[in-house]
Design a protein with these regions (language model features):
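Extracytoplasmic "Venus flytrap"
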Residues: 26-44, 62-65, 144, 196
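Hinge/lid segment of periplasmic solute-binding proteins
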Residues: 88-147, 173, 199-203
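Short, solvent-exposed loop/beta-turn-alpha elements that line the ligand-binding surface or hinge
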Residues: 106-121, 165-167, 207-232, 279-280, ...
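Extracytoplasmic "Venus flytrap"/periplasmic binding protein-like
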Residues: 43, 47-121, 157-159, 258, ...
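Extracytoplasmic/periplasmic substrate-binding proteins
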Residues: 32, 200, 205-207, 231-292
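Glycine-centered hinge/linker elements that transmit conformational signals in sensory
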Residues: 173-179, 216-249
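Short, well-ordered beta-strand elements
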Residues: 24-35, 55-60, 84, 137
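Extracytoplasmic/periplasmic solute-binding protein
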Residues: 132-141, 146, 156, 170-222, ...
Length: 292
């Protein structure tokens, strides 16, 4: 978000609270940006704060996305919710179902006098943040996608082509076998399992993840992850785990650190991991599309 947009959006949000006249309006911005992205968020807020005297944005790191989301829900119920909350995309649907919890971003922009055109966003991204009636509810910010990360140095050492990452799941299994023979105790892992191995897996194969337009068209939806394709995929991962080719490293993004450190040679996760790899890893990392 540009600083001007942030200023006007903050101005609109500040209408929700009663503050003394002439007082500087403080805007609480809860987020889940850690590391380099956290530094960027702090810099973004500082740049805006230094540009004017009427508003002060206070960025507050609240932990992982689930932790931030839970904290925001608790704060809302207690009557002291933050003005701005940055969480993962799936938070939009939950907030959409919670009447009165949020003000749609289109309304915030309109109140603030900001020209706002949701159509400028990539449709696949905008869909995450938009209600069935076409109204954008939340603002795409630092959106990421699921990708395949791999250690090019480990590939070379295992006799694999570092410029040809596996593009299919059978190829992932074969690459993992070569990495295991080369001495890797964790050839392949994954973070955000439900996102990478179910939701994105479904989209990549053009199959349904949940009924009712992925839940946007009604609360009586159900997950559709018990199809033969999904069952076969999870069984293949289980088989790889039994062979020591796939190693589970915990929930959410716990596996990310094991890839950055070089412990695990391949992983599926967020494209946001790229920054940590470039900054902290002692190996050359590669990125490719999800396997199919």
């Amino acid at each position: 978000m540009k600083l001007k947009s942030l200023a006007l959006a903050a101005s609109a949000c500040s209408l929700l609270v009663a503050l003394p006249a002439q007082a500087q309006t403080e805007i609480q911005w809860w987020h889940s940006m850690s590391g380099q992205l956290g530094e960027w968020v702090n810099g973004l807020a500082k740049g805006f704060n230094d540009s004017q005297k009427d508003y002060k944005v206070v960025p507050v790191f609240k932990g992982t996305y689930p932790e931030s989301f839970a904290a925001a829900i608790a704060a809302f119920r207690a009557g002291n919710a933050p003005h701005i909350l940055q969480v993962f995309e799936v938070g939009t649907a939950s907030m959409m179902a919670s009447k009165g919890a949020i003000i749609p971003v289109t309304e915030v922009m309109k109140t603030g006098g900001v020209k706002f055109d949701p159509s400028v966003y990539v449709p696949a991204v905008a869909g995450y943040y938009t209600a069935p009636n076409g109204q954008m509810l939340s603002l795409p910010f630092n959106s990421s996608t699921t990708v395949f990360h791999y250690n090019k140095d480990a590939f070379k050492a295992a006799g694999l082509d570092p410029d040809k990452p596996p593009t299919t799941w059978p190829e992932v299994a074969r690459a993992a076998a070569s990495l295991k023979i080369a001495g890797h105790k964790c050839p392949f892992t994954t973070s955000w399992q439900s996102w990478t191995q179910l939701e994105s897996f479904s989209a990549w194969h053009n199959v349904e993840f949940a009924t009712k337009n992925n839940g946007f068209n009604g609360l009586d939806t159900r997950l559709a992850v018990d199809t033969p394709l999904h069952v076969r995929h999870i069984q293949n991962l289980a088989n790889m785990a039994q062979q020591g080719l796939f190693v589970y490293k915990g929930r959410n993004n716990s596996a990310d650190a094991t890839f950055v450190s070089g412990e695990c040679a391949m992983t599926t996760g967020s494209s946001a991991l790229y920054g940590a790899v470039k900054r902290n890893s002692k190996f050359t990392g590669g990125i490719s599309t999800l396997p199919y």
